[in-house]
UniProtKB/Swiss-Prot annotation:
It comes from the Bacteria. This is Uncharacterized protein TP_0179. Residues 450-464 have a biased composition (Basic and acidic residues). Residues 169-183, 336-357 have a biased composition (Low complexity). Coiled coil: none annotated. Residues 57-82, 96-121, 160-184, 198-232, 247-277, 335-358, 449-579 are annotated as: Disordered.
Length: 627
C-alpha cells in the first residue's frame, strides 16, 4: 500500500473545481477509503482540500465566469496545479446544491450568515465546511480509526474504466481531455469500484462496519487547526446545534447494524493495526473475556469429568448384570446336568420262534399257528429250487431293485382289460422270493443232504435184508439208485430238463464202509430241473411245488430190477425234514408276497381271485400255515 501523499504546496487560490464536458468537478482527498467511496456515490465533501488551500466559496466566487462557459479550459499556468491535485485527490461531480451561486452577504469569516440568509443547500455546505475544517488533517497512512489510504494510481487509475461518472464513455472523455493534462483519468462508477475493491487481497476493510463507526461515533475533540478558522476560534459547539437542527435535511444512508465482534482466544490473522491507540476499555474487555474463557474451560473440564464418571458407572453396572446372568446360566446347567435323563425301557429281544404279525390277504386265522409240512412237500421245495453261487451283495442290491422296479412299474388306473403288467409284477415278486430262498437255504443245505443220504443207506440195508424173491433176483445198486432218483423227482415236470448234480456221491462212499461188500457202482448223470422264474411260468411253479400229484420223469437208465421195486414204499421216508429256520424264512417270503398283492389295485386283486392260480395260492398258504 502506498503512503498517503501530502497536499502539494500551491497558491491559496488553487483550482480545486473545474468543468469537464459541461460537468462541474471537484477534487476529494484520498485519505479514507470509506469517505472516498461515499464521495464517489453522493458527491458530498469529506476532508476536502479546500481546508488547506482555501474554501469552496472563494474558488466558486473567483472562477464563476469560467465555470459558466461550457467550453472553458484551464489556463496554462494552472494546468500544473491540476496535475498536482490529481496526485493527492480524485475529481468527482459536484452535487446540484454546490452549483448554486454563493450568497454574497455572508463572508467566510461569518459561518452563521450562510445559515440564515443562504438557501438550504448553501447553508448545509457551509456547516459541513466548518465542521470538516475543524477536523485535524492526518498526514500518515492511517487515521485514528485505522482506515488505510486508498492508492488510486494502483487500484483505480491503472485499471481504467469503461464508463465515466456522468454516463459518457471513456473514449469520448479521453478525446475531450486537455492535451497537457497527462495525469488525468476518468473516475469509475461506484459499483465497479466496490466490486474491484472487494476483489483485492491487499487490504480488506468492512465498509459496513466503517460506515457504522463513522455515523455512530462522535468526532474527536480538535487538537488544533492547521489553518485559521473563519471565525477566529475552533469552538464547534454552535455548529453542533446547527447540525442537530439540519439533520432532517441530510440524506439518510443504510447502516449495517451488525456489530463488530472480537475474539480474545483467536487473534486476527492480519495482526494488530499499526499505530492503533491503546484503549483501556479494550484491555478490560479482553481480560474479562479471558476470565470467562478460563471459567468456561473449567466448567467444560468438570462436565467431561462427570461424563466420564457416569460412563464408568454404567460400564460397571453392565459388567455386574452380565456376571449375574452368567451365574444364573451356570446354575441352570448344573441342575440340568444333575438330573439324570429318563432311560428308555430296554426292549427284550424277541424269541427265535416268535411269529411276526401279518396283515396279509388271508388274515382270518391265528398268526401263531404252527407250520405243518410233510416231508414230501419239503423235499419237493428243495429239489425244485435252483442253487447258484452268487455274490451276496449283488443279490441284496437286485432284491431291492426288484422291489422298486415292481412298485414303479405298477400301472394304476390303466384301461380295463390290459393285464400284461400284472404278470410282470408277479414274476418280479417270485424272482425276489427265489433269491431269498437260495441265500437262506444255502446254510442248511449240507446237513439236510447228509440226512437224506443216511436215510437212503438205511433203506438200502433194509431192502437187502428182505428175503423176498424180488430182492434176490435183482438187487443191484444201480437199480436201487434209479428207483430212489425216480421217487425223489416225482414232483418235477415231465418236460423240464434236469441239471447234473451228484447228490448221492457221499452215499456211495458210506455204503462201501458197511459190513457187506458192494460192487462198483456206475455213476448216472441226473439232471435237476432249474427253476427260472420267467414271466409265464411263475404261478405254475408255485402250484407244482405244493401239488401232491407228480408226473414221472423219463430218465434214460438201465431197466430196473425187480428187487428194487419193493423198496418204493420206503422211499417217501427219504425226504429230509424242513428245519425251523428255513420254514420261518419261507413264511416271511410268502408274507411279503401277500403284502405286495395288497398294494395292487382292486381290479387286479379281483382278477387274480377269479383266476385259476388263486386256489393254488390259497392252498399253499394253508399248507404252510401262513395267515
Amino acid at each position: 500500500m502506498t503512503q498517503a501523499l501530502q497536499v502539494p504546496s500551491a497558491p491559496a487560490r488553487c483550482r480545486h473545481l473545474r468543468r469537464k464536458n459541461g460537468v462541474l468537478l471537484r477534487i476529494v482527498e484520498k485519505t479514507d477509503r470509506t469517505r472516498y467511496a461515499h464521495a464517489l456515490r453522493h458527491g458530498c465533501r469529506h476532508r476536502m482540500c479546500e481546508g488547506v488551500h482555501g474554501t469552496e466559496e472563494d474558488a466558486m466566487g473567483s472562477e464563476s465566469a469560467e465555470m459558466d462557459s461550457p467550453h472553458a479550459t484551464a489556463r496554462p499556468q494552472e494546468q500544473g496545479e491540476d496535475r498536482a491535485w490529481d496526485a493527492c485527490g480524485v475529481w468527482v461531480k459536484v452535487p446540484p446544491e454546490a452549483q448554486e451561486p454563493p450568497v454574497s452577504s455572508g463572508g467566510p469569516e461569518d459561518p452563521e450568515a450562510p445559515a440564515q440568509h443562504a438557501p438550504p443547500g448553501a447553508r448545509v455546505d457551509a456547516v459541513r465546511h466548518h465542521v470538516y475544517r475543524a477536523l485535524p488533517v492526518q498526514s500518515s497512512a492511517e487515521d485514528s480509526r485505522g482506515f488505510v489510504d486508498l492508492s488510486v494510481e494502483d487500484e483505480v487509475l491503472a485499471r481504467g474504466c469503461s464508463h465515466a461518472p456522468g454516463g459518457e464513455s471513456s473514449s469520448d472523455q479521453a478525446a475531450d481531455a486537455p492535451a497537457g493534462d497527462a495525469a488525468y483519468s476518468e473516475v469509475p462508477s461506484f459499483d465497479d469500484l466496490v466490486t474491484r475493491t472487494a476483489q483485492s487481497q491487499d487490504d480488506r476493510v468492512d465498509l459496513s462496519a466503517a460506515m457504522s463507526s463513522v455515523v455512530t461515533e462522535e468526532p474527536p475533540e480538535p487538537r488544533g487547526c492547521s489553518m485559521p478558522c473563519p471565525s477566529g476560534s475552533c469552538d464547534t459547539t454552535e455548529f453542533d446545534d446547527l447540525l442537530s437542527s439540519l439533520s432532517h435535511d441530510a440524506p439518510e444512508y443504510p447502516v449495517d447494524s451488525d456489530p463488530i465482534t472480537y475474539s480474545a482466544s483467536e487473534p486476527s490473522s492480519e495482526g494488530p493495526v499499526r499505530g492503533a491507540p491503546f484503549s483501556d476499555v479494550d484491555a478490560v474487555a479482553q481480560s474479562l473475556m479471558g476470565d470467562a474463557q478460563v471459567a468456561a474451560q473449567g466448567a467444560q473440564a468438570s462436565t467431561s469429568g462427570d461424563a466420564s464418571t457416569d460412563l464408568l458407572l454404567k460400564i460397571a453396572q453392565e459388567i455386574s448384570s452380565i456376571r449375574a446372568d452368567l451365574d444364573q446360566l451356570k446354575g441352570t446347567f448344573s441342575r440340568q446336568a444333575g438330573a439324570e435323563p429318563a432311560q428308555a425301557p430296554a426292549t427284550a429281544p424277541a424269541p427265535e420262534g416268535t411269529e411276526a404279525a401279518y396283515s396279509g390277504f388271508f388274515c382270518d386265522d391265528d398268526p401263531d399257528e404252527t407250520i405243518a409240512l410233510t416231508n414230501d412237500e419239503l423235499n419237493n421245495i428243495l429239489i425244485t429250487s435252483e442253487f447258484t453261487e452268487e455274490d451276496g451283495k449283488d443279490s441284496a442290491a437286485d432284491a431291492f431293485g426288484g422291489e422298486l422296479s415292481g412298485f414303479e412299474s405298477s400301472h394304476i388306473g390303466s384301461a380295463a382289460g390290459d393285464f400284461s403288467y400284472l404278470e410282470e409284477d408277479d414274476h418280479a415278486a417270485a424272482r425276489v422270493a427265489q433269491e431269498q430262498w437260495v441265500q437262506q437255504g444255502r446254510a442248511t443245505l449240507g446237513n439236510e443232504v447228509f440226512d437224506v443220504k443216511e436215510q437212503g443207506a438205511h433203506a438200502d440195508r433194509d431192502a437187502a435184508a428182505d428175503p423176498s424173491p424180488v430182492a434176490k433176483d435183482d438187487a443191484s445198486p444201480e437199480a436201487q439208485r434209479a428207483h430212489v432218483s425216480s421217487t425223489g423227482l416225482d414232483a418235477a415236470g415231465a418236460e423240464q430238463p434236469l441239471n447234473t448234480e451228484n447228490v448221492f456221491d457221499d452215499e456211495d462212499t458210506q455204503r462201501e464202509d458197511t459190513s457187506f461188500p458192494l460192487p462198483e457202482e456206475q455213476e448216472l448223470d441226473v439232471s435237476v430241473p432249474s427253476l427260472e422264474f420267467s414271466a409265464p411260468h411263475a404261478i405254475e411253479t408255485a402250484a407244482s411245488e405244493s401239488s401232491e400229484v407228480a408226473t414221472p420223469v423219463a430218465i434214460e437208465s438201465p431197466p430196473q430190477s425187480e428187487a428194487a421195486r419193493p423198496a418204493q414204499g420206503d422211499s417217501a421216508n427219504l425226504a429230509p425234514p424242513l428245519s425251523k429256520s428255513l420254514a420261518d424264512e419261507v413264511r416271511s417270503v410268502l408274507g411279503y408276497m401277500d403284502r405286495l398283492l395288497e398294494s395292487l389295485p382292486e381290479e387286479k386283486i379281483e382278477e387274480f381271485a377269479r383266476s385259476e392260480y388263486f386256489h393254488t395260492y390259497k392252498h399253499l398258504f394253508d399248507e404252510l400255515g401262513i395267515s
